[in-house]
Amino acid sequence: TEIYTLSLHDALPILLFKLLEDSKSNSNKDKPTHFAVIFDSARKNFRNEIYYDYKANRSEAPEDLVPQFKYIRKSVEAFNLPSIELINYEADDLIATYSEQVLKEGAKVTIISSDKDLMQLYKKNIRIYDPMKNKFISNEDIDKKFGVSPEKVVDVQALAGDSSDNVPGVPGIGVKTAAELINQYGTLENVLKKAGEIKQNKRREMLLENKDKAIISKKLVTLKKNVPVEKKITE
């Protein structure tokens, strides 16, 4: 079985040599047959067209960290590792797109990243390795983080919002309440449809008044799986 490994650049300092080692080792039965390093191309992307202030609150990277970025790219080039980025899209969108392509080829994917936004991709034949925790993410980890199964993560994020990315969500609704609502009503769309029936006054009012924010938020947090990537998965 072919195993494709997709890695976000933030994992590189820990995993650059590990990837190389695994790719050459004959003893590792799960060694990747293909892998790529995925970079963000720029701060702004198509999501800023949906919501201008998306990630607008992000501060600049610490001064001592900035020089490392170019060394990461240089390391990737020096080791002749395939790297991919695409203007107007985030690295997460490319990972989502390539993951779907890999599944269509009947192969498996390992995503190496600590980014919680990638948890929505977790399913059969797609596993996620968190280099910060040195472990593979499980269904239980995702449930502990978001209170729902992987396919409903975006619905919880849409309601709760995300202050780190400036995703608005619905004011007054956190992850716990969002998970409660999604587990009860199934989807964000159904929550909004049935919002008038919710007994808690404040919660009902917030949902009714902020439907548009919730809908926009879901568009922001949902990863694109059909990005017009230039490189084929076999490259």
What are these regions (language model features)?
Residues 1-3:
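Short, well-ordered junction/capping motifs at the entry into regular secondary structure
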Residues 6, 11-112, 116-136, 213-216, ...:
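Noncatalytic, basic helical substrate-engagement surface that gates or grips nucleic-acid strands
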Residues 25, 29-36, 79-81, 104, ...:
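Non-catalytic nucleic-acid-binding/docking modules located in mid-to-C-terminal regions
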